[in-house]
Amino acid sequence: MSKKKALTSLPYLASIVFLPWGISLSFNKSLEPWVTNWWNTSQYETLLNEIQENNVLERFIELEELFLLDEMIRDYPETHIQKLRIGIHKETIELVKMYNQDYIHIISHFSTNIMSFAILSAYSILGNEELVTLNSWVQEFFYNLSDTIKAFSILLLTDSCIGFHSPHGWELMIGSVYKDFGFSHNDQIISGLVSTFPVILDTILKYWIFHHLNRISPSLVVIYHSMNE
């Protein structure tokens, strides 16, 4: 009977997996024009805030130095000097537009993810009965396995997620989430998360093995440690 209930709850589980993608796509399409209009009308004059100003000025100085270097190498007449100033002005405008678009992208993606999280949380609370049914079925299935298979399954899962070869996978996943929120790629932040997040998970797992598995099946813990060594 519990297996039958679990099977009826599988569509709910599938909807939880695929619902965020659908929400993200639909909200991105509908939110981005609104965010673009709001940003361009109310925020364009204050675009060069402290962070943006530093970024734009750094790039502007680089461009100006390149143009001035070009000017020193060649003996430009006055008309060419005027074109030089116009070129710097155009490059500055393009730079401001680029940073403007980047911030629109960040705001729209961040807002979409917040809304997706809120909708998914409400959906999970409303479907709490299905989640409880699935959880009980998974626990029943796991406890019916032999201790050797249990230990092998736990070891396979942990080595895949937080083992020696897992950092590259974590780097890809964290980078994907970081990009999904609209932020530009940052190696230092991603490396910091990759070096700390798996360690936290490993600590939680060891506590779970010691506190939970040692209470329900001491032999499973012994087999797990033997296989792990």
From Swiss-Prot:
> Topologically, how does it sit relative to the membrane?
Multi-pass membrane protein
Where in the cell? Answer: Plastid, Chloroplast inner membrane
Q: From the UniProt record, which GO molecular function terms apply? A: antiporter activity; proton transmembrane transporter activity
- Which of UniProt's keywords are assigned here? Antiport, Chloroplast, Hydrogen ion transport, Ion transport, Membrane, Plastid, Plastid inner membrane, Potassium, Potassium transport, Transmembrane, Transmembrane helix, Transport
Q: What PANTHER family does this protein's entry cite?
A: CHLOROPLAST ENVELOPE MEMBRANE PROTEIN (PTHR33650:SF2), CHLOROPLAST ENVELOPE MEMBRANE PROTEIN-RELATED (PTHR33650)
Q: Which family does it belong to?
A: Belongs to the CemA family.
Protein name as it appears in the record: Potassium/proton antiporter CemA
What is the source species?
Answer: Amborella trichopoda
What gene name is given for the protein in this entry?
cemA
